[in-house]
């Protein structure tokens, strides 16, 4: 209960800071053309830095996807993972916080996303966030989740669920 309260307060502070300052690390009105302000970040552009991309793409899930793990991932996504706050309850990138972010959160129901981005890349983002890196990699303001609020095992479960929203493999 206490950690959930602290996490939600931290989330509110971060979102509030973005709203009041109109900025954030790696956030902008998208001068590089990575997405349209208020629109989704371009799916074709990796969030993983170029010097780490091959390594991230090579990362494979440590266990197979099962219906039980998908259900656990969904429960985390909609609950203590707080993913729904930005990505929406259906994973469409339309959560309550999406309205105040300069770039819309990822729409996991877009099948092109699953086709272009690997599970390893998604885990990299869950571990490192998407804060941008001095013009090399654009950011969206997503904070690291795995290692901060979720275990790596739970991160894989959430990732499996997110990927399931884009249709079958």
Language model features with spans:
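Bacterial N-terminal signal peptides
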Residues: 10-21
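Bacterial N-terminal signal peptides that target proteins for export
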Residues: 2-12
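Sec/Tat-exported extracytoplasmic proteins
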Residues: 80-81, 87, 129-133, 162-166
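Axial heme c-ligation environment in periplasmic c-type cytochrome domains
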Residues: 28-43, 101, 106, 125-155, ...
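Detector for the c-type heme attachment site
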Residues: 86-93, 112, 127, 145, ...
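Short Fe-S-cluster ligation motifs
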Residues: 112-128
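Electrostatic cytochrome c docking/interface patches
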Residues: 43-78, 169
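Sequence/structural segment immediately N-terminal to covalent heme-attachment motifs in c-type
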Residues: 67-90, 98
